[in-house]
A protein has these predicted regions:
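Second-shell loop/turn segments in exported
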Residues: 1-6, 25-35, 44-45, 49, ...
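Non-catalytic, structured segments within soluble enzyme domains
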Residues: 1-190, 357-359, 369-373, 377-380, ...
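Soluble non-cytosolic domains of exported or imported proteins
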Residues: 9-16, 31-42, 53-57, 74-86, ...
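Acidic/histidine-enriched alpha-helical segments
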Residues: 35-37, 50-68, 134-145, 251, ...
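Active-site SXXK
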Residues: 48, 118, 261-262, 282-313, ...
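Short, glycine/proline-biased beta-turn/loop segments that scaffold the active-site neighborhood
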Residues: 66, 231, 283-339, 415-435
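A penicillin-recognizing enzyme superfamily signal
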Residues: 108, 112-115, 121, 152-159, ...
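Active-site-adjacent helix/loop patches that line small-molecule binding or acyl-intermediate pockets
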Residues: 110, 311-316, 329-376, 381-408
Length: 608
């Protein structure tokens, strides 16, 4: 593993290194803690000489050898640790401890190109976010005397060399400032004594962090930011230089799935898996804010409204025992816009229109029943007016599943990551059989009338019979008697909302991208993208979800302890750029692909 040799071929120094690892494999790891490993190697060699296993010349020769090792073995083709942990957990449930010893092979649904794009875009987005919040300061400051600075690096105190060998999250590097120069550069030192220059262009961003709402003044010199002895994080730039960096305190997630069958093609659940294994893509249940509004609008369409329906954007005052004594939702802008078409309200993310659609056009009970078809349940669906503003709790994976249903024309698909499992002899133990979108398998028109009357009584919802619930859920199933040959070996995804409903929601969300809160996505130069921003109360969560017919992708950014992200950190600024960067790479060279207009839709020009 460390020396790429058989045990019979290692020398005395290498043998002592391996023996030294045993008491504390992490502390004495020769790859990641070379200074510790070298010190421990010396102790083992001294004991070998003392006990007569080696003579003095052999001891001296072994001590003189440099500590050179690296990891050998199969190269990691794809960095997807959060998915790997999901797979490990599932394999343990299926096969127990044999998971580690029986030689299973697991094939996942990941697309390596998309996974790399997810890793890259989330890392860059979080690093950019933390720059905007200000510089937190060095990891620590180390007293560097003139004597230390003048010595060879191998003669530096072992404690300092150990600090340079500590793990750096997210692909950053640990460096030590050895000089702050008059030309506004800094001299830095890496593990092993490697030196480099840190230019002013990589330092000048570092306005001091004061609190979550305040930063200090812009630095004028490198000395305003750095001091000799500062232990810092740095990162390489595209110009071949180094830049000052810091580990983001905020976290994030990116999830992308194939709308045609639910295959998870990319997933990353945080900035760095080694320092935090909590998978925010799957395990973080956060308020989706306005990114939930497309589901409210879908419910409104189901109950007799159209994108041209005019709704009054005016104050709403609600008395509710489940909310505050009196609930007065407001628009983000604090203004009221009067009569507004549904399409324009979604484009401008008007909160009051969403509330009125839920309470006065659809009804909470009807909306909950409709939205549950997208895969939501429980905490995601509060039975009160806060539902209109995304006041429930959903994971990024939940949101991706819901957006995929809109993207694929109304079919319910379930996300999955394990495509196949093979045994030690290559035998197939499991192969996924996901429900797939099969438009040819579905009758063009549903065989029932859409409900148009609104029910408001929550108690009636609880007293409904199973037959009545089935009538309202209106899930259309394919009829195998029509074209039985289409159904051979096909697990067809059920149509849970009509193609017309899905198309209209897509179309309104496309306008969000073209001229609304998601217009930064127009930088991609595509015409097939639909999406929606989301920002929860006090800017504690920033979201963007978007799709075309090929991919549905959700981005979330927030703090694990639910503190606010800070002034100006809405979905359009914090999450959307990550989504744009991911989508640029994911759809590079892929032609525009959007759902065709289904029968039953009439396009009419509306005079604004």
């Amino acid at each position: 593993v460390y020396f790429n040799k058989d045990l019979a071929d290692i020398n005395e120094a290498e043998a002592a290194t391996l023996a030294g690892v045993l008491p504390a494999p992490s502390r004495y790891n020769p790859v990641y803690s070379a200074a510790n490993a070298e010190m421990r190697r010396g102790y083992v060699l001294a004991r070998m000489e003392e006990l007569g296993y080696i003579d003095e010349p052999t001891f001296a020769a072994a001590m003189a050898l440099p500590m050179e090792s690296r990891l050998y073995g199969a190269a990691v083709e794809l960095n997807a640790p959060f998915v790997a942990e999901m797979v490990r957990s599932e394999m343990l449930k299926r096969y127990g401890e044999g998971t580690y010893t029986d030689g299973f092979q697991v094939v996942t649904s990941l697309d390596s190109r998309l996974q790399k794009a997810a890793n890259y875009s989330l890392r860059n987005g979080l690093l950019e976010f933390t720059r905007r919040r200000g510089y937190y300061g060095p990891i620590r400051n180390i007293e560097l005397t003139d004597e230390i600075l003048a010595a060879e690096f191998t003669e530096w105190p072992i404690e300092i060399r150990e600090m340079l060998e500590q793990y750096a999250p997210g692909g950053l590097s640990v460096a030590l400032v050895t000089a702050v120069n008059d030309d506004n550069t800094a001299s830095i030192l890496f593990r092993g004594g490697v030196t480099a220059a840190l230019p002013w262009g990589g330092i000048k961003w570092a306005r001091p962090f004061i609190d979550r709402e305040t930063r200090g003044p812009e630095p004028e010199t490198a000395g305003d930011v750095l001091s000799v002895g500062d232990l810092i994080y740095v990162m390489p730039t595209t110009r071949g230089t180094w830049a000052l960096a810091q580990v983001p305190r905020a976290q994030g997630a990116v999830v992308s799935i194939d709308p045609s069958d639910g295959a998870v093609t990319a997933l990353t659940g945080g900035f760095d898996f080694t320092t935090s294994k909590f998978n925010r893509a799957r395990q973080a249940f956060r308020q989706p804010g306005s990114s939930f509004k497309p589901f409210i609008y879908s419910a409104a369409l189901e109950y007799g409204n159209t994108p041209a329906t005019v709704v009054l954007d005016a104050p709403v005052v609600i008395s509710s025992s489940e909310l505050e004594a009196v609930w007065r939702p407001i628009n983000y802008s604090g203004r009221f816009y009067g009569p507004t078409r549904m399409r324009e309200a979604l484009v401008r993310s008007m909160n009051l229109v969403s509330v009125r659609l839920l309470l006065f056009e659809t009804g909470v009970g009807n909306a909950v029943r409709h939205i549950s078809k997208f895969g939501f349940g429980g905490a995601a669906l509060p039975h009160n007016g806060s539902l209109a503003l995304g006041g429930g709790a959903a994971s990024p994976l939940d949101m991706a599943q819901g957006y995929a249903t809109i993207a694929n024309g109304g079919h319910a698909v379930k996300p999955y990551v394990i495509d196949a499992i093979y045994g030690p002899e290559g035998e197939t133990l499991y192969r996924a059989a996901p429900a797939v979108v099969c438009d040819e398998c579905i009758p063009a028109e549903p065989e029932f009338e859409f409900p148009t009357e609104t029910e408001f009584d929550g108690e009636e919802r609880e007293e409904m019979t199973l037959d009545e619930m089935a009538d309202i859920v209106n899930v259309y199933r394919p009829d195998a008697t029509v074209d039985p040959e289409l159904f051979a070996n096909v697990n067809v995804a059920p149509q849970v909302i009509s193609p017309q409903n899905a198309f209209l929601v897509q179309d309104m969300m496309r306008d969000v991208v073209k001229r609304g809160t998601g217009r930064r996505a127009m930088a991609l130069g595509r015409q097939d993208l639909s999406g929606k921003t989301g920002t929860s109360n006090d800017r504690r969560d920033a979201w963007f979800g978007g799709f075309n017919a090929d991919i549905a992708t959700i981005v979330w950014v927030g703090y694990d302890d639910d503190q606010p992200l800070g002034p100006g950190e809405e979905g359009s600024r914090t999450a959307l750029p990550i989504w744009v960067e991911f989508t640029r790479m994911a759809l590079n060279g892929v032609p525009n692909h959007q759902m065709p207009m289904p029968e039953g839709i009439v396009s009419v020009l509306i005079d604004r």
